[in-house]
Amino acid sequence: MAERTHACGKVTVEAVGQTVQLKGWVQKRRDLGGLIFIDLRDRTGIVQVVFNPETSKEALEVAETIRSEYVLHVEGTVVERGEGAINDNMATGRIEVQATKVNVLNAAKTTPIIIADDTDASEDVRLKYRYLDLRRPVMFNTFKMRHDVTKTIRNFLDTEEFLEVETPILTKSTPEGARDYLVPSRVHDGEFYALPQSPQLFKQLLMVGGFERYYQVARCFRDEDLRADRQPEFTQIDIEASFLTQDEILDMMERMMTKVMKDAKGVEVSAPFPRMKYADAMARYGSDKPDTRFEMELTDLSEFAAGCGFKVFTSAVESGGQVKAINAKGAASKYSRKDIDALTEFVKVYGAKGLAWLKVEEDGLKGPIAKFFGEEDANVLMTTLEATAGDLLLFVADKKSVVADSLGALRLRLGKELELIDESKFNFLWVTDWPLLEYDEDADRYFAAHHPFTMPFREDVELLETAPEKARAQAYDLVLNGYELGGGSLRIYERDVQEKMFKALGFSQEEAQEQFGFLLEAFEYGTPPHGGIALGLDRLVMLLAGRTNLRDTIAFPKTASASCLLTEAPSPVAEAQLEELNLKLSLKEEK
């Protein structure tokens, strides 16, 4: 078999007159009565191959048997297309290849999905036949971008003198965070490894070990309920460094991300990225990952509501809640009563009891609650919300968390429905000064907002024992277009501070020692100040490639129920395998 001389998408007018050897898949076959045209595809693109009896009867006879997705080896001569046959939409659109020989390397059944960017297959079919789905150019281009992003990050971190170090996949189960995937040990009866949710502890121990600058393209595993932007196994760019301040870490990440955007996407983004405190993000956008590509910020009306004539508003404030509103500029005529009812049902999903609304017309406020506001109150509302005729005002009165969640989600929905979002923009944002702990009423205890190894502000360390809810974290999240790309923090590196953190989280001394004794001991041997960040590679590629589903950026992803439709994993194992591990199944009976 002759060697391939050209990739299909790389045959240009410079090759006219040359004999070429091409190999690829049949994208399309057209029989024009005596002539057969085939679009031959490989990962670089498509080239048109012509089978003409005047050039080769033998090749034409073979071409008559060819169907879509056959794998071919074609030998032929490159010629320029006639003036009326030029296709400027293709890189190879000014030439074609006159076939002199063709060899079918492999035949193909009719594929269950159309191998094209616009396929008609459901996602389940695409996942079952993932190897066919990956042939679509849009999929290859996504993974080419993933490669480019990873390569740029590796090159950047190399110039910054970071070492790429691999950390264990079989590790110790810890109680914080999501559920672990457990792996039984054959050697140690009744004991289990866990697959890592992140390399967090190991990268900190590398700092104890004096490596100073570490990174890893790390596989991570979390047994959690899945959403469109979650997978049970995922990849993160894991970074840790000693002796750097928070500002130095953020500056380095900004330089890295601007290079990624330029090299992988061809987009210039300016640094430094804006910074916003967590409290401000929640107050202004109702989200800890705000999409800043459009306005429509939340306005706090609690002070006004406390003295207004609308009891729903006043009672919310009196019970310790708040009233906030968003002004959908010019949207009054675009939302009917039925549409607003749909918005009301939408916010109820986030815990809101309802959605109050007003439309601003030339002669004043109109709507179900307009009668509760006199002229003075109406003017205050108009002024505070910067409202003009044609605006739609939407209010939620409830607990602070419910107001933030519901109006934050409503803001995003309206932004999409009203086409306020400039999809060409890439808005990076740092969210800083997070709360260190979050209180869970159901569990009646505090949980770490990020993880238990996050350093509090120095002046807040004592609050861990007196007022844990007030302690702030030296933590930072990187947000892009309303998606959390990753999070990081400065880390605790002193044993006494780490023990205070564990105590605030409800660990007894014995529990802390059992779970994290190795880390606590390491802190007694001269641990340097250190910090880092972990960026979600899958999500970053999803945003840069313009995809809407995380599964499109992972070669062989799982479904929303954490199963692989291609291999049918997870699956039962043989009884002998369980016996070897001294395990016995006790399955719940189906009701």
UniProtKB/Swiss-Prot annotation:
Disulfide bonds: none
Gene Ontology BP annotations: aspartyl-tRNA aminoacylation
Catalyzed reaction equations: tRNA(Asx) + L-aspartate + ATP = L-aspartyl-tRNA(Asx) + AMP + diphosphate
Signal peptide extent: none
Family annotation (PANTHER family): ASPARTATE--TRNA LIGASE, MITOCHONDRIAL, ASPARTYL/LYSYL-TRNA SYNTHETASE
Family: Belongs to the class-II aminoacyl-tRNA synthetase family. Type 1 subfamily.
Name used for this protein in its record: Aspartate--tRNA(Asp/Asn) ligase
Organism of this sequence: Bacillus cereus (strain G9842)
